[in-house]
């Protein structure tokens, strides 16, 4: 009997150490996770690498396709005489969000799938990529957007001119401040989602599935469009706004164009600061 009691006692205490749960479990993972070093500000060696230019081409093509599909969708809605005869605002939002989902999925392994200068700017502030790469991405994104809108106009010039070409403007009844605020908050939501979905620390955990990252990013774009299309037509992407404005090239398309650069860049900067300083507390970790 004593032997059996000893076996029971040993069995009950075989795993004497308590397993951490909740935040405690995350704390144990934190000890094993090592923060990747920040990207250098300038990386001249990138200019000699084919992967650098391949990534830029991927950004160009993705933004080209993004503008092509979304501008056509906007034109179709604006050309309709009845809300029931077209996809409406919900369809426009699905078009933008769905394209971002598909294009991020296709290009994430090549360029990171930014497709947006504001996203690139936010990731640059977080030292996720060099200034060299960030500037190259932004140029290629803008060129892709211009070409995408240009192809749409080439196919349907008359309809493009009469429906506004998908250019972003502050809607009547709203002030410039309203438009700027909508762009700041909308871009904050998008870029914060990008940071959360692509967080290397989360990728290191077994419970996180990196292949699903495009889904929340695309869904964030969808939701922001639902909320802000009535205010600004939803920019949150300076390349998208620039491409449509250049090809449409009417006076009112340029009246408030600065909003669609200043707003997204402020929103991206705030999202980068919030994620890196508040959520991840990276500056404080470096001091410890």
From Swiss-Prot:
Tissues and organs where the protein is expressed, per its UniProt entry: Expressed in roots, leaves and anthers.
Keyword Disulfide bond: no
Origin: domain of life: Eukaryota
Membrane-spanning residues: 57-77, 92-114, 135-155, 177-197, 211-231, 259-279
GO cellular component assignments: plasma membrane
Main location: membrane
Expression triggers: Circadian-regulation. Expression is higher during the light phase than during the dark phase. Down-regulated by chilling.
UniProt topology in membrane: Multi-pass membrane protein
Keywords: Cell membrane, Membrane, Repeat, Transmembrane, Transmembrane helix, Transport
Subcellular location: Cell membrane
GO molecular function: water channel activity
Region (Disordered): 1-37
Chain positions of motif NPA 1: 116-118
Motif range (NPA 2): 237-239
Transmembrane helix among keywords: yes
A biological-process GO annotation: response to water deprivation
Function according to Swiss-Prot or TrEMBL: Aquaporins facilitate the transport of water and small neutral solutes across cell membranes.
UniProt comment concerning the protein's domains: Aquaporins contain two tandem repeats each containing three membrane-spanning domains and a pore-forming loop with the signature motif Asn-Pro-Ala (NPA).
Similarity annotation: Belongs to the MIP/aquaporin (TC 1.A.8) family. PIP (TC 1.A.8.11) subfamily.
Protein name: Probable aquaporin PIP1-2
The species this protein was found in: Oryza sativa subsp. japonica (Rice)
């Amino acid at each position: 009997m004593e032997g059996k009691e000893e076996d029971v006692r040993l069995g009950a205490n075989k795993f004497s150490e308590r397993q951490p749960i909740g935040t405690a479990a995350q704390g144990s993972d934190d000890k094993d996770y090592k923060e990747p070093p920040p990207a250098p500000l300038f990386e001249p060696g990138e200019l000699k690498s084919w992967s650098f230019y391949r990534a830029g081409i991927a950004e160009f093509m993705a933004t080209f396709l993004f503008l092509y599909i979304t501008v056509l969708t906007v034109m179709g809605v604006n050309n309709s005489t009845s809300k029931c005869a077209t996809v409406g605002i919900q369809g426009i939002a699905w078009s933008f969000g769905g394209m971002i989902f598909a294009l991020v999925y296709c290009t994430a392994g090549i360029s990171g799938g930014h497709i947006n200068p504001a996203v690139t700017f936010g990731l640059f502030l977080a030292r996720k990529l060099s200034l060299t790469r960030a500037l190259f991405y932004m140029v290629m994104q803008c060129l892709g957007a211009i070409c995408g809108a240009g192809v749409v106009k080439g196919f349907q010039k008359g309809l493009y001119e009469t429906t506004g070409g998908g250019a972003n403007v502050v809607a009547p009844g709203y002030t410039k401040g309203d438009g700027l605020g909508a762009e700041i908050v909308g871009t904050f939501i998008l870029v914060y989602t990008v940071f959360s979905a692509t967080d290397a620390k989360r990728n290191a955990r077994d419970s996180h599935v990196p292949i699903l990252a495009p889904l929340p990013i695309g869904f964030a774009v969808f939701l922001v469009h639902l909320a802000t299309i009535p205010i600004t037509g939803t920019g949150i992407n300076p390349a998208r706004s620039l491409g449509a404005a250049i090809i449409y090239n009417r006076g009112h398309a340029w009246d408030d164009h600065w909003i669609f650069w200043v707003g997204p860049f402020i929103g991206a900067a705030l999202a980068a600061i919030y994620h890196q300083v508040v959520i991840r507390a990276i500056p404080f970790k470096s001091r410890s």
